[in-house]
Amino acid sequence: MKILVTGGAGFIGSHLVDRLVQEGYDVVVADNLSTGKRKNINRAANFYKVDIQGSGLDRVFRKERPTMVMHLAAQM
């Protein structure tokens, strides 16, 4: 199963990504890195630097075709 995690470079998102990778899922991360850090993202995950408010996320969906989305992206 392929899972897209928005906000996967943040504290909670990166820990979720690590766990999903550990469990054997194919993980895709979409994050604009406004508060998260690239170094937080598990190397086994496909990473896209993209703002979820823009059309860039559409390209991620078309290319990766995730089965599930876990939405953790937010601006505070």
Model region roles, listed by residue range:
Residues 1-76:
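N-terminal Rossmann-like NAD(P)+-binding domain of SDR-like oxidoreductases, especially those catalyzing
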